[in-house]
Amino acid sequence: GIDDIAMTTNAFFLKDQAQGLLDAGLKRLNVSLDSLDPEKFRDVNRRDCLQSVLDGLDAARNAGFKSIKINAVAVRNFSESEIMGLIEMGRSDGFEIRFIEFMPLDADKVWERDKVLFGHEIVELIKEKYELVPIDNSLEIGPASEYNFADGKGKIGIITAVSNPFCDHCNRIRMTADGKLRTCLFSEN
């Protein structure tokens, strides 16, 4: 059987749904959040609802979810100024922040390799302020390289889908918003 299910959400409506999701058996949440700047958030999401997302995160934390991760897509000339704010939020609120290299999913035809902020660059930016300790996750199953903060206040994950693809050992199944199952983000069917 299935022992564990995680849900990825934009969290626009999470404030009102967090407790019900937890009560239904969901234990882990991944929330997509690329910016804490209201204007940048609106530009990326085409909606002016950053506060709704932040309220949803608070509601999920207060409901008692076992794990809440923030997924931030790392785009060159956009994300550099967002990284430390997301890190500080994660450290203070108990969220794991995961930075994902900008991948060529490209429904909007905007992907260019020059726009990828690579995982090693993200780690170097963070190391300007914090000491990071790599986590040996050779026994873990998942796409992220993980790091603890040396002071013990939280951890981050770096998903290097472009610079170090993980397709050979991917173990994920995804359900699209319209209910279709996909074994790969890059598949057409």
PLM feature segments, named:
Residues L36-P38, P104-A107:
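A short, flexible beta-alpha/helix-coil linker loop
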Residues L105-N189:
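Accessory C-terminal segments flanking Radical SAM cores
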Residues G1-R98:
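Radical SAM/AdoMet-radical enzyme domain recognition
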